[in-house]
């Protein structure tokens, strides 16, 4: 889907019951606002919906918390895991007053980086992605002593080498 009319037709035909508007907070956590299909109209899809930005850690103070979630209709996909037919759409976060992209929106930051790379001539394509780092331990022990805050000992889990 790519247009508001296409999305609205899915709601009208009963193919979709809910719209799940998703965005990422500054720490990379996926946030969302789910709307009942009866609340979805052309204005919401083209202009967005207001939400309280003070609810997102690191964004806005309560006295200046109005923000807008503006759907990017090129990102719509049916959620395969919900019991009710739900359409997912990723959103841009805008300042409610200026309607400009919010400077702490990770999606907007990624877009600015992409534009900078193209404009500066560094390259014409940029690849970005999260880097999930973690450790797998076979055993972890910790101890707290009277004169020491904490000591930790561990052994790494040895994984077999996978050859192709």
Question: Where would I find each of the regions flagged by the language model?
Answer:
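Flexible, glycine/charged-enriched surface loops at secondary-structure junctions
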Residues: 18, 120-129
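Surface-exposed loop and adjacent secondary-structure segments within mature catalytic domains
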Residues: 149-154
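Conserved small/polar residues in nucleotide/adenosyl-binding loops
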Residues: 155-161
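Short, Gly/Pro- and small/polar-rich lid/capping loops
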Residues: 1-18
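Short, conserved secondary-structure transition motifs
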Residues: 132-143
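Short, acidic, Ser/Thr-enriched surface-loop or helix-capping motifs
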Residues: 25
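Glycine-rich, N-terminal phosphate-binding loop and its surrounding beta-alpha-beta segment
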Residues: 41-120
């Amino acid at each position: 889907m790519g247009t508001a009319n296409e999305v609205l037709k899915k709601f009208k035909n009963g193919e979709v019951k809910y719209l799940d508007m998703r965005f990422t907070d500054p720490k990379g956590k996926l946030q969302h606002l789910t709307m009942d299909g009866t609340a979805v109209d052309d204005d919401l899809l083209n202009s967005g919906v207001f939400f309280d930005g003070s609810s997102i850690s690191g964004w806005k103070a309560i006295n200046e918390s109005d923000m807008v979630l503006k759907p990017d209709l090129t990102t719509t996909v049916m959620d395969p895991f919900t019991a009710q037919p739900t359409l997912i759409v990723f959103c841009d976060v805008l300042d409610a007053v200026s309607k400009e992209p919010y400077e702490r929106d990770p999606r907007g930051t990624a877009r600015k980086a992409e534009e900078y790379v193209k404009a500066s001539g560094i390259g014409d394509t940029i690849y970005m992605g999260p880097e999930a780092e973690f450790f797998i331990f076979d055993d972890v022990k910790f101890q707290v002593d009277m004169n020491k805050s904490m000591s930790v000992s561990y052994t790494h889990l040895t994984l077999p080498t996978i050859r192709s």
